[in-house]
Structure formats: C-alpha cells, structure tokens
Curated annotation (Swiss-Prot):
This is Photosystem I reaction center subunit psaK, chloroplastic. Keywords: Chloroplast, Membrane, Photosynthesis, Photosystem I, Plastid, Thylakoid, Transit peptide, Transmembrane, Transmembrane helix. It comes from the Eukaryota. Its main location: plastid. PROSITE patterns: PHOTOSYSTEM_I_PSAGK. Belongs to the PsaG/PsaK family. The gene is PSAK.
Length: 131
C-alpha cells in the first residue's frame, strides 16, 4: 500500500525557496466527476421564471397593503388575528402602508418566488415549461 502511494506522486525538491523542478505525477489519478451547479436563466420578460417572481412579489405586496399580512401598523396576536396599533412611522398611504412594509413584503415575495423557482427547477417541471 505504501509503495502505491509513493509511486503516485513525487515529492518536490527544494533548494532554498526555489524548486529544482516541478513535481510530476508518476501515475494519473482518476478524474472525479463533479456535479454541475444548477442555474436559472431569465431570458425575457415573459419567461416562466420572471412571471413567477413578479406574481409572488405582487401577491405579497397586495397582502401587506390590504391587511392580509402583518405590517408595521398591524401586529399579529397569538391567534394570528391582526390588530391595529400606532407605530409612529409617517406615511402618505391611507391604509398606513410604510416604506418598511414595502421593503419587507417585497423581500418576502422574492424569497417565496426563489423558493418556487428552485423547487420547480429541482423537480424538473420548470425545464418542461421552458422547452
């Protein structure tokens, strides 16, 4: 076993900080096959990936704006009922939808969209939709 390991690679020899020659492999090691990373392409505006992302972000913003999701001015109680409270944030929106609510709902919508896209890609359904 030790002779096989020593025969696979040679030890480089040094003189100071420089090597005499580059180490050469006496035997080639089998190449390891790597798993390809998955990628998502969003080629055009009407692509399925783009439609999924726009839909989930829009639905989450709609839910936050019209009181279907917790926001800065509506907190969720133990029974998941939403009750109004004063947050101290100024807004020009009649429903009280603030900038923080917009950013939070947009981020959650994107997270949901990415989860849906990657899930469909992993199951192979998104490949069938694309072509």
């Amino acid at each position: 076993m030790a002779s096989q390991l020593s025969a696979m690679t040679s030890v480089p020899q040094f003189h100071g900080l420089r090597t005499y020659s580059s180490p050469r492999s006496m035997a080639t090691l089998p190449s390891l096959r790597r798993r390809r990373s998955q990628g998502i392409r969003c080629d055009y505006i009407g692509s399925s990936t783009n439609l999924i992302m726009v839909t989930t972000t829009t639905l989450m913003l709609f839910a936050g704006r019209f009181g279907l999701a917790p926001s800065a001015n509506r907190k969720a109680t133990a029974g998941l009922k939403l009750e109004a409270r004063e947050s101290g944030l100024q807004t020009g929106d009649p429903a009280g939808f603030t900038l923080a609510d917009t950013l939070a709902c947009g981020a959650v919508g994107h997270i949901m969209g990415v989860g849906i896209v990657l899930g469909l890609k992993n199951t192979g359904v998104l490949d069938q939709i694309i072509g």
